[in-house]
């Protein structure tokens, strides 16, 4: 991999995409953002969906021509797959693989299926990645406000010899070069992304919040107190870290809180936890996690669905819903309730 570099607007040229038709496969959170941003950057964009998709009319209402996936791929010279990881292989095999032409660019926003060999593209196409480091609605909002979400780009297969230029042009088209586009590889992006999700951002933080809440409840404290101290205030602390690192957070809290941070943090995240984190990373690197997740999907997701029901039924979720209902400034999405 080349030395880490950040690319901005002046480093990318939309002309690499000007004469190409871009097919966005999927019109969910990332799909709608990519399609709209590319279109408003002056590029020729169509949308590919399966017949009967609920997103079909939504995409049409935004002014896009919508086709079944195979027909969209046949027309396009650039194909971006923005489908859930677990669905990509099936749709690729059924509708994408045989409709790619020599010299096409096949894009991904996450390296899972390439890195774990679920999808093996033909040798005569470019295989590229643009991975925005933010959810689709933020990618869209930043673009409309004249900014952009930073992205990672990778070139897995460079048949045309222009893979880097095409990837950077795509990144510019969705606004990424406003925030900066950094180089990576499919391997690095996949392994670090999965580790971050599992050990820190999703698995780690949810388990930490639940453990703190349960500890206070078991000690006889009210559900409301436990929720506010272990869950509600999390956003305020994370916002400070997001804005100025841990230093700004520690500057902003009381000295008592800062002292508690120093003397207790490493008691919780101790050597045993760090050793377990290394095991988690190893399972990502050696493919164990991917194998288990793919098998879970092949068998109808029994453990996944059971755990989803259990977690949704936790007391902390019910208390949180009630308390958030008292906070008029929180715009809660009813579909998540």
Swiss-Prot record:
EC numbers, comma separated: 1.1.1.86
Gene that this polypeptide is encoded by: ilvC
The reaction(s) annotated as catalysed by this protein in its Swiss-Prot or TrEMBL entry are: (2R)-2,3-dihydroxy-3-methylbutanoate + NADP(+) = (2S)-2-acetolactate + NADPH + H(+); (2R,3R)-2,3-dihydroxy-3-methylpentanoate + NADP(+) = (S)-2-ethyl-2-hydroxy-3-oxobutanoate + NADPH + H(+)
Keyword list (alphabetical) reads: Amino-acid biosynthesis, Branched-chain amino acid biosynthesis, Magnesium, Metal-binding, NADP, Oxidoreductase
Catalytic site: 110
Source species, domain of life: Bacteria
Summarizing the function annotation, the protein's role is: Involved in the biosynthesis of branched-chain amino acids (BCAA). Catalyzes an alkyl-migration followed by a ketol-acid reduction of (S)-2-acetolactate (S2AL) to yield (R)-2,3-dihydroxy-isovalerate. In the isomerase reaction, S2AL is rearranged via a Mg-dependent methyl migration to produce 3-hydroxy-3-methyl-2-ketobutyrate (HMKB). In the reductase reaction, this 2-ketoacid undergoes a metal-dependent reduction by NADPH to yield (R)-2,3-dihydroxy-isovalerate.
Residues bound to Mg(2+) 1: 193, 197
Q: Where does NADP(+) bind?
A: 27-30, 53, 55, 85-88, 136
The family database entries (InterPro entries) matched by this protein are listed as: 6-PGluconate_DH-like_C_sf, KARI, KARI_C, KARI_N, KARI_prok, NAD(P)-bd_dom_sf
User: Which molecular-function annotations from GO does this UniProt entry contain?
Assistant: ketol-acid reductoisomerase activity; magnesium ion binding; NADP binding
HAMAP family named among the record's database cross-references: IlvC (MF_00435)
Q: What is this protein called?
A: Ketol-acid reductoisomerase (NADP(+))
- GO BP: isoleucine biosynthetic process; L-valine biosynthetic process
Q: Which family does it belong to?
A: Belongs to the ketol-acid reductoisomerase family.
Pfam family of the protein (one): KARI_N
Co-factor binding details: Binds 2 magnesium ions per subunit.
Q: In which pathway does it act?
A: Amino-acid biosynthesis; L-isoleucine biosynthesis; L-isoleucine from 2-oxobutanoate: step 2/4; Amino-acid biosynthesis; L-valine biosynthesis; L-valine from pyruvate: step 2/4
Domain KARI N-terminal Rossmann, residue spans: 4-184
One GO cellular component, as annotated: cytosol
Q: Please list the residue ranges annotated as the KARI C-terminal knotted domain.
A: 185-330
Name the residues that bind substrate.
254
Q: Where does Mg(2+) 2 bind?
A: 193, 229, 233
Give cofactor(s), names only.
Mg(2+)
């Amino acid at each position: 991999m080349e030395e880490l570099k950040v690319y901005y607007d002046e480093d990318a040229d939309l002309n690499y995409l000007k004469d190409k038709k871009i097919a966005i496969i999927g019109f969910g959170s990332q799909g709608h953002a990519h399609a709209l941003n590319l279109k408003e950057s002056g590029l020729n964009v169509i949308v590919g969906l399966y017949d009967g998709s609920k997103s079909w009319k939504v995409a049409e209402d935004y002014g896009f021509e919508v086709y079944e996936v195979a027909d969209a791929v046949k027309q396009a010279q650039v194909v971006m797959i923005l489908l859930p990881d677990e669905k990509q292989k099936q749709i690729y095999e059924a509708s994408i693989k045989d409709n790619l032409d020599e010299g096409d660019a096949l894009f991904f926003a996450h390296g899972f299926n390439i890195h774990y060999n679920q999808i093996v593209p033909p040798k005569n196409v470019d295989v590229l990645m643009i991975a925005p480091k933010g959810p689709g609605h933020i990618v869209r909002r930043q673009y409309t406000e004249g900014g952009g979400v930073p992205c990672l780009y990778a070139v897995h297969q460079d048949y045309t010899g222009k893979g880097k230029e095409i990837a950077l042009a795509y990144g510019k088209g969705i606004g990424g070069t406003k925030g900066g586009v950094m180089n990576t590889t499919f391997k690095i992006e996949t392994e670090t992304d999965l580790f971050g999700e599992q050990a820190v951002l999703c698995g780690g933080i949810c388990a930490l919040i639940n453990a703190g809440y349960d500890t206070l409840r078991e000690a006889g404290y009210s559900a409301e107190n436990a929720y506010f101290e272990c869950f509600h205030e999390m956003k305020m602390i994370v916002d400070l870290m997001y804005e100025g690192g841990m230093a700004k957070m520690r500057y902003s809290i009381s000295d008592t809180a800062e002292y508690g941070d120093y003397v207790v943090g490493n008691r919780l995240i101790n050597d045993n936890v760090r050793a377990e984190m290394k095991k988690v990373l190893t399972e990502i690197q050696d493919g164990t996690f991917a194998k288990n997740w793919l098998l879970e999907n092949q068998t109808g997701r029994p453990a996944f669905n059971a755990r989803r029901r259990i977690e949704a039924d936790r007391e902390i979720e019910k208390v949180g819903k009630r308390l958030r209902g008292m906070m008029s400034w929180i715009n809660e999405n009813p579909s998540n309730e």
